[in-house]
Amino acid sequence: MVNLLSCLLLFLLSLHCFVACLAVNTKNITTDQSALLAFKSLITSDPYDILSKNWSTSSFVCNWVGVTCDERHGRVHSLILRNMSLKGIVSPNLGNLSFFVILDIKNNSFGGQFPIEVCRLRRLKVLHISYNKFEGGIPAALGDLSQLQYLYLGANNFTGFIPESIGNLQWLKELDTSNNRLSGPIPQTISNMSSLEVLKLFSNYFSGSGGGGGEEEDEEEK
């Protein structure tokens, strides 16, 4: 009888833990869904109706076009929306996607300033926003993305300096700031980036030795 009671209590405790974990996961994925819906709400042109028809609360967020979820945690892992002719600004709510690893919106028409809130995503490894219309300065807070390995900012309208904090990205393998309107000296802190393999800085207005330099490649843009 005692053993039966112990087993029953253990079962109830396990059931309670399961329900509690399920509730937490549901709340977290709802947070991710809300962040992506906020992103969608700031898109002013979706000529192929990709998001307007697919991104809906009637379907599971992990099944949305361009969205991938992490199998282990069940959270939004990546957003890849390249070459879709989307126009608008990027919602700061993307900074709530705490399990985000990849943000790739290459070759669209996103504009305005890039939201500093994205720099809260400490798991981010790939940030690809080339071939858009972003303007203003490159956020110094990008230097807080300690896991970042690939940073592509090329072919936008960024102005000002490359922030010194860029040198904090110890795991960065590729950096592209080409074809912008950046000026001033190239920060010496770039030499601290021990993992850097590809550096593209050309077609800017840098001053001093090496301005507009970097390794230029003939291969197709990534």
What do these predicted ranges mean?
Residues M1-K222:
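Plant-biased, solvent-exposed loop and capping regions
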